[in-house]
Amino acid sequence: NINEVLNAMNGGCSSMSWTTEDNKHLWGRNFDFNCIAEESKIIYIPKGKSYYGCGTRVENNIVEKTKTVSKYAAVGTGIRLMQSTPILYEGVNEKGVMGGQLAYRCFAKYNDKKAKGTIAVQPPFLVTYLLTRCKSVDEVVDMVENKITLMNIPIL
């Protein structure tokens, strides 16, 4: 049974990227969940859209200091269940930056305290945050290493 194997290995999603002979960049991933939220769909986030990096209106715990505005439009698969912030499972922005959430059971560790000088971001909002704020992989790396703290705050 594949579920028993995955549970024994603490398996998770995978992704891959490659460059074609004509210098195009491709990215793909699998989705290792046996179900996906019914409300999931293709989501477009326009440039100039306000949203939050931490907290939800559904749970009445929005962190106002994390409010931001998208610098770049993005499109991908996701859900708008949280109202205050669209959640992208994966997507691409107008500059060609691509990414996705990869669940890898038992390996992810998040912070209980926000690092000084950073913005708190809940893990489910990370892809949305990076795709709407970064125009290059270098900007993504800088954002993750220096400008945000992934917080250990579950949704729902």
Question: What are the roles of these predicted feature ranges?
Answer:
Residues 1-139, 149-151:
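N-terminal mature-domain region immediately after signal-peptide cleavage
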Residues 142-156:
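Internal, well-folded beta-alpha domain core
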